[in-house]
């Protein structure tokens, strides 16, 4: 075998291994979402923050929050639930997803930003502090900058 054949064969083998790993991870994630305890989801009620609060609604099921983050839209889990019952057997969620969520910073409130046009800006207008522009000085500055030329050298 030549070196090129070995490199190509190794690349194909590495690609197949990576695709197998991705397929196994996707299957495990599908099983995890499908095979959760049904009682925990049906018994827990989500608080209705949309009506009573200015904060977005949060899921009460912390496994969904840890895996996907908080979502303000309805979950597609209920539609796929019938299909998952035939595929899955009961198993526990991975241990790395069971850590408690981090604290909410800034008290959990949103920070409002204003643009410059929204803020009331008062400029200090003291005409007495402004200096009168001297025309001689202005022409001297123009000449000083117009005389400067770039010098190029061979490298």
From Swiss-Prot:
It is a single-pass membrane protein. It comes from the Eukaryota. Its main location: membrane. It is found in: Membrane. Keywords: Membrane, Transmembrane, Transmembrane helix. The keyword Transmembrane applies. The chain crosses the membrane at residues 6-26. GO terms for cellular component: membrane. InterPro entries: FAM163 (IPR029379), FAM163B (IPR040280). The keyword Transmembrane applies. Belongs to the FAM163 family. This is Protein FAM163B. The gene is fam163b.
């Amino acid at each position: 075998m030549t070196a090129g054949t070995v490199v190509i064969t190794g690349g194909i083998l590495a690609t197949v291994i990576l695709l197998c790993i991705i397929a196994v991870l996707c299957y495990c994630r599908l099983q995890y979402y499908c095979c959760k305890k049904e009682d925990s989801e049906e018994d827990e009620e989500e608080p209705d923050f949309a009506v009573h609060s200015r904060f977005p609604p949060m899921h009460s099921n912390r496994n969904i929050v840890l895996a996907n983050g908080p979502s303000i839209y309805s979950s597609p889990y209920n539609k796929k639930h019938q299909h998952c019952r035939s595929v899955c057997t009961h198993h526990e969620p991975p241990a790395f997803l069971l850590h408690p969520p981090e604290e909410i910073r800034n008290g959990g409130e949103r920070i409002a930003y204003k643009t410059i046009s929204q803020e009331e800006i008062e400029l200090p207008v003291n005409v007495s502090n402004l200096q009168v522009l001297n025309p001689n000085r202005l022409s001297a500055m123009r000449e000083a900058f117009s005389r400067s030329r770039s010098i190029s050298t061979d490298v």
